[in-house]
């Protein structure tokens, strides 16, 4: 998208980026966002990997605005779903799945179908997946134990969603999603089947075992 915008300028100032989750750290005031100086924080990711590249070659007036990058507030997690609904809902969600437990955003196995945005204690499996994702984490103890996340209902209410599955490590979750017909709480990524318009995109490595289905 950034390459396309560089070649063909468009006004994307109307675009709102709704972030699905963020790591939290405990403080005297309760849970707070992990600092955006951490390369593993979603605040860092969205600014460096999404908004930054998209905005880079556009005139200032045509760029995504800082106030149009939304994160749920750990001081009032429940307000996030209302804020999204009042804005007209999610037009398009880009999803990914945990390799070992099928978590989506930070929703762990067992998440209720009607769950909404909330603070979650991260499962050990989710933390181990993220330990592999971010090389800056040396040991499991360095991975935050809590996060704030949209819920399964928040995701299912999206008008359209795509689940992106990449790499041999995601073969299990791809198989679980393809074998499901509806949301299965023990594998949260199956929420993709609850979205009105949905697709699963896979690379060859993740899809390799599909011949055996």
Where does each model-flagged region fall?
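Short, flexible loop segments at the rims of nucleotide/cofactor-binding pockets, characterized by
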Residues: 69-73, 138-144, 178-180
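Short, well-ordered amphipathic alpha-helices
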Residues: 1-7, 46-52, 175-178
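Short, conserved loop/helix-junction motifs that constitute active-site signature segments
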Residues: 6-15, 63, 155-158, 192-196
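ATP/nucleoside-binding phosphotransfer catalytic cores, i.e., glycine-rich phosphate-binding loops
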Residues: 150-153, 157-213
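A short secondary-structure junction signal
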Residues: 81-82, 103-110, 115-117, 173-177, ...
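Ligand-binding beta-strand-loop-alpha-helix segment within the catalytic cores
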Residues: 10-96
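Class I SAM-dependent methyltransferase SAM-binding "motif I" and its flanking Rossmann-like core
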Residues: 102-150
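Active-site histidine-anchored catalytic micro-motif
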Residues: 1-34, 89-92, 103-124, 164
